[in-house]
Amino acid sequence: MSDEKISMTLNFPKHKRARRKKYQKEYQERHKEEMMQQLGRRFQNQPSTSSAPPDTVEKIPLPTESTSALPFGDSPRLTEKDYETNYMIDPPVVSTHSAELIKSNRVVIKAEEAEKYMMIKAKSTTSKILQDFQTKILETVKTKRRLQADVPYIIHPCHSMKGRKTPKQKGGDESFTASDVSDDSNDSQDEASTSEPTNRQAPEADKTGEVKDEKQTCNRRNQQRKAKRLRNFEEKERQITLLKKGIDRKKTHPNGIHPDISFNEKGLGNEGPECRCPEPIKTCGLKHGYYAGEDKAIDCKKSNGENLHYYTLRVTPLPSENQLYRTHMAINGEEFEFEGFSLITHAPLPDCMTRAPICKYSMDYEFQLVEEFMPDECFDPEDCDMLFEYIFHEIFEMLDFELRPKHIPSDVESCPMIHIMPRFVQTKDDLVQLWSSKTVLAYFTSKGSSEIMSPEDVNRLCDAQIDQFTRNTSKHKQSIVLNTKFKPSAIRADWFERDEEKKEVYVVHNAIRAQTYTAISLPRIAFLEKTLNKMIQEKQSSGVYNKDFEKTKNELEHLKRENRSARNLKLREPVAGFIETGLKPDVAAHVVMTILACHHIRYNFSLDVFEEVIEYKFNDRRVIELALMHSSFKSHYGTPIDHVKNMITNCGYRRKYGAEDKREKKRVAGIMSLFNIMKGTSGGEPILHNERLEYLGDAVVELIVSHHLYFMLTHHFEGGLATYRTALVQNRNLATLAKNCRIDEMLQYSHGADLINVAEFKHALANAFEAVMAAIYLDGGLAPCDVIFSKAMYGHQPVLKEKWDHINEHELKREDPQGDRDLSFITPTLSTFHALEERLGIQFNNIRLLAKAFTRRNIPNNDLTKGHNQRLEWLGDSVLQLIVSDFLYRRFPYHHEGHMSLLRTSLVSNQTQAVVCDDLGFTEFVIKAPYKTPELKLKDKADLVEAFIGALYVDRGIEHCRAFIRIVFCPRLKHFIESEKWNDAKSHLQQWCLAMRDPSSSEPDMPEYRVLGIEGPTNNRIFKIAVYYKGKRLASAAESNVHKAELRVAELALANLESMSFSKMKAKNNSWFQNMRRRLEQDTSD
């Protein structure tokens, strides 16, 4: 704001007509702003609030007589219709024991006859079968695997633990100051219409200096951007080079069965190393396989199955369902089918354990753990360990899947945390016959002792008739065959072919090339998709298709068809060296689900340790699992996901490329999606990370800290309390509390470069701590949160913990522990509040607290209220934040934290609280000062409401505050959502800039706010802010603080943008804004 305008606002002339003349121009500007806002309301389909302009000068309202209109108009008063919804009842977010394990009632016995039959077929006995399997099968395949060529890995640099921000250059300053920015020389005309007039009397030299400074600043920023782009380009080139080397290494591997078929290697994915973490952090964290609590050696080999717990892993739908080929074995006319795996643990699973992980994996199956009896003679730990190594490591090559606890040194003997046993069962008359582990060993021994076809069999089949060849090879069709000479060692044999001239029989495997191995056309496809999307956006903006649209679309479809056919691959390999495993493709899905279930079980055992640390037991672990899930975490199979994909592709049921279930892809970006989400008209999906809980936990932690500081530091003003609270709730302190609770050992996040940086990891820990506090709040209320925060903060300092936990009563309550309502009948000041209590339906035990809430700062200190209401207002703000956050979290389960923050801001804003103050008539009960006091401003009314909430919290507790806020505040949310008043000016401007962006631009231009100048003394600062879009100034404004100035300049810029947009769109019949308005009208009519 200029000096001339400041003087105008401070020196009011006495003559009434002179006042009208001086404020006539301001009224015209204000009316113009209202007209611009009407355009915005029309765009948002809001009812018009404008009135007819005055006919004469006398009808212009004086500034003191006109009400200060809110940016989007006053919210309407509540009616009975607004209370048709019960705001005190919430949908459940947690449920007690919702995941209780199922116990099977099946009668399970050992299949004795099957064991005798398999021992005869394997030419062994029950006492020798383990040794025979180890020597004939396991050692044979291992010896053959050792002959594979040892090709060194491509060395990738480790991720850096240092900050990613580049150091500032000498002489350069990244911050925006008044000397760094100045007025643009080419937009002075725009400024006259959209902002306050500039000081035209400034010296010409100053203007020249400002322009020169701005040019230097722009040049410096351009140089910094170029240097950053160059660094990013060089780093990208290095990564691409390493990626190509890694792919070429796999393609040219001497033992690769085919250059285009990917295979598994320990610690290596399809595109490079799975772990690029620095050495200091390789020995910790879930992503490296370190589970909390797995620090004790376990040996159950000599316990004869004592203290073991048996669970059957049921996979639904059954992988062999509706499949012609499945894993089974016929013995004496009885068919034993492969049912899956049994998981044997050394401790019972927690009662409150979730049935499945919270994260979603890209498999079409789900698993369920069923507690089921197993005969003692069916299970042997050593047998299961051998079977695990053979099935998971040698056949399916899940080389990074380990069940042995990593906290224990390698030279210490210990059992795996979970024993895995294959299940072959035959059900008859509700009686289940189960193969013992030794029967399974005999089965694999009999199958893998010799090759699929001997040389004599090959010669015979080459000379046989085609029908005989088909019959003899059909029994091996869709079998998983193994040859550890190759990579991958196990493939699915889709069918067999022969070459009569060469006397060879071939295994035929239909494969799908990995994306990283595929055609060269992928970059072209990506480019065409991007180009096509830009053309579609241009059509939405202009209503006219690009002339090259059809050509680009046809080329894209053609390349996609070629790429789809190029990914199909037929592999022919001679049968020599291949052995039959006795398994069919249905086992692949069971293997993946078993790996996932093992991680889930071990993680829940770790949560037992976490519950012991915080001394709290959750009723439902879904909420704590979600709290410990970082936003970077997608899915976890307990092993690298590339290994799982390769195994399913090579060994699972064949699925034609392109026939996968196509998920519906919805456009989630854009202004219309945001409006639809806030209205609840777009379908939502569960948000599978902890950011929603972190949003709620932030309010929980703030209230806990505010509560303790308020009652501990009784003589500190609100400014000092706010400083202490900021220090306690900052990320650095919360990250320390998270480590004290061992959250760093429980947090699930992606195995990449995101959280390698120490500062970023501490930030994630702080957010996780807040999410955990929210989870405890939802599960058990506010009291356990207070206890756990206290222990995390001062658990190792008993003296400080005692001081923190010792909460004194409020001084007014200490004076009258039984209540002071008797004083209200003899004190006129207190008796006036009976009417307010009757109006609200709330009766205070200590009515002096209620009087203190209505005692403003200008009231002298007295024995009745013992001070003013500023401390209560500070406490009430935290109470209001928590209760509103809790309401939004429960009522909007599909809203992201950003959406809920917008709604909360609209509910707890000063404007809303001022309306609440007027609706409840709080101003009538303000204790008057002995001298004349001015009328309450908007901020004063808001402080009055917060002080009342603080007094209610101190006197009656959190539940009374919850009832008051939900009844008084929450019904207004419907109005904010329907009228879209949650969208403040800065957010609205950003959405407009995104909507008006150039489709050909790689990155959308965002509005940029710059500080043009700071004027005035320290106690009366005036900040001048300008907003720029694509380098051009849209508006500038001056206010008493930066936040107000940015909001004001955003409003002015919106008015200018809307007028420009509508005048431009007037020349176009099918404009983007008309489409948006039509869509909004359709949504409203629907």
UniProtKB/Swiss-Prot annotation:
Highest taxon, organism lineage: Eukaryota
Biased composition range(s): Basic residues: 13-23, 159-168
Subcellular location: Nucleus
Names of the cofactor(s): Mg(2+); Mn(2+)
Residue ranges with Polar residues bias: 43-53, 191-201
InterPro entries: dsRBD_dom, RNase_III, RNase_III_dom, RNAse_III_DSRM__animal, RNase_III_sf
Disruption-associated phenotype: Sterility.
The family this protein is said to belong to: Belongs to the ribonuclease III family.
Listed name of the protein: Ribonuclease 3
Top-level taxonomy: Eukaryota, Metazoa, Ecdysozoa, Nematoda, Chromadorea
